[in-house]
Structure formats: C-alpha cells, structure tokens
C-alpha cells in the first residue's frame, strides 16, 4: 500500500496489527526493501502494530521527477519522518538493519522522545563495526576530485551492484546457505536496482554514507543520554558489519541485550523465528 507525502513522494509500506497497539517501525537496508520483513511481520503483528516502509531509492517507493530529490541519508530520514507524521505515529520501537540504522538513529536525534526501544540487527553505529568491505568506499568519501570520484564509482559499481554481489549478501556467512536460499529476495533486489537511473542513486548513497560515520559520535551520545533499551541481535559471520559493532553498544547502553547468532548479514532471512522470539521477549518487558 502507499502513503502520499505532502511533497508528492509515494511511500510504499507494509502494515499489520492493530494501530491501537504499540508500534514497531521496521527499517530495511541495502539492497533490499520491506520485502525482507515479509516473514517477520506476522510474528510481531499479534501483539504490535508493525509498519515497514520502503526507503527512497529502494523497493516500490516513488519519487516524483519534478521534485529534484537528492538521495542522501539526511533526506531519507526526513522522508521517513514525514511518513510517520502522516500516519500520526509519535511513539515507536525501531528495528534498524544496515541502511536502516543511520536512518533510525537520525530520527532519534531529531525526536529522541519518540523512540521506545531499538532492535539493531546488524545495524551499525560504531567505527569498529565497519569491516574492510568499506575501505574502497572510504576512498569515495574522501575524494573531491571529479575524475577520481568517477573512477571510484565505476569500481564500486562493478564490485557491489552486480547480481552475484546481491546474492552474496544474502548467502554469505550462512553455515548452510542452501537451506535458506530464497531466490525471490536477491532476484527482486537486483531487478529493482536495474531500473534506469537506480545505479546512480545507489552510488550517490554510497558516497553519502560517510556523513553517517561523521554522526556516529552523536548516535552514541544519544544512546548514553537517552538510555533507550537496545536489543542487538547480529549475524556473527557478517563481513559488512562484523560483530565488533554489536559489542560496541556495551560502551553506551546500560539496558542492553546482546545476541550473536550463527548467520550472516541478512540474519532475518535465516533466523526469522529466533529474531521474532527475541524481539517479543525484549519488547514485552520494555514497552
């Protein structure tokens, strides 16, 4: 279903559960969409109101051509904030994964009183949570030379925006990949990334990701000052956001439950039932 924002953006989202119940906002990551939560949502919806929007540039959210929308994490967070305003959601627990993490933490900086709890599933807010995967992207963040930037964008495109790399994000780090291989996930993601102009959107966001790293100290300050309860449930074999990022929450979060599972980046695909159970136990005791 869609919500039309005041600026004309059509946000596609999935929703389940009664709006009279506490809300859980599910924020997906690269290269996915709210489709990644298709199996988790029913596990949560009996007790909670669950909302999962597609971020701008992903899934089926539509940006009007005449809006001249700049694809940045600041604008993604602003868009999701507007989506929440339209739905009159002013209190919510937030599940952050991959790109959903800087989106969720930016929302928290804007409205710290809105967040009732955080579930971080490989959703990073610490330098030590960035693996060597990010080294070429650090070069992209650092350069201001247009020629060098063009070369780096092409290199990143060839390494990351491919079908093989997309499939690898789902199956990498999984001890038994054949048992959790769901081709619809990576085929859908790659098809959506293959739309005209979408590769440039993804490269713009890779370039902009450095602005999130600059904000990591602010995200950490928020965690310390708000003392929001955090469930960090991570795939310990993630080569993009390694478990050191989960361990780092210990520095700033007093009310922390940390669980490392034998899986990779897309842990919600391989450990859906376990994540659902952990979330329900955690949220039932916190909100």
Where are these regions (language model features)?
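Flexible "cap/lid" subdomain of the alpha/beta-hydrolase fold that forms the substrate-access gate
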Residues: 1-19, 23, 31, 51, ...
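The serine-hydrolase catalytic nucleophile loop
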Residues: 30-41
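Recognition helices and adjacent regulatory flanks at domain boundaries
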Residues: 36, 55-58
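Conserved ATPase "switch" residues in P-loop NTPase domains
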Residues: 44-45, 250
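Active-site machinery of serine-nucleophile hydrolases
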Residues: 45-54
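Conserved SAM/SAH-binding loop
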Residues: 263
């Amino acid at each position: 279903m869609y919500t039309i924002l005041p600026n004309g953006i059509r946000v596609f989202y999935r929703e389940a559960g009664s709006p009279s119940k506490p809300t859980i906002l599910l924020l997906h990551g690269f290269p996915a969409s709210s489709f990644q939560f298709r199996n988790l949502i029913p596990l949560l919806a009996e007790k909670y109101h669950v909302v999962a929007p597609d971020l701008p540039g992903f899934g089926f959210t539509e940006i009007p051509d005449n809006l001249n929308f700049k694809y940045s994490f600041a604008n993604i967070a602003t868009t999701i904030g507007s989506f929440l305003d339209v739905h009159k959601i002013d209190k919510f627990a937030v599940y952050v994964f991959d790109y959903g993490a800087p989106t969720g933490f930016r929302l928290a900086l804007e409205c710290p009183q809105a967040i009732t709890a955080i579930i971080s599933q490989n959703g990073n807010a610490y330098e030590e949570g960035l693996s060597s995967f990010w080294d070429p992207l650090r070069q992209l963040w650092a350069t201001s030379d247009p020629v060098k930037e063009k070369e780096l964008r092409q290199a990143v495109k060839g390494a990351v925006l491919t079908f093989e790399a997309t499939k690898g994000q789902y199956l990498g780090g999984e001890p038994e990949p054949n048992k959790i291989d769901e081709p619809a996930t990576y085929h859908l993601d790659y098809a959506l990334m293959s739309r005209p102009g979408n590769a440039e959107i993804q490269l713009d966001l890779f370039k902009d990701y450095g602005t999130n790293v600059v904000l990591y100290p602010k995200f950490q300050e928020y965690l310390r000052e708000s003392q929001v309860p955090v469930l960090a449930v991570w795939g310990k074999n993630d080569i993009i956001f390694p478990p050191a990022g989960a361990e780092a929450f210990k520095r700033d979060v007093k009310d922390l439950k940390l669980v490392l599972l034998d899986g990779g980046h897309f842990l919600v695909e391989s450990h859906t039932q376990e994540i659902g159970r952990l979330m329900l136990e955690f949220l039932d005791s916190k909100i």
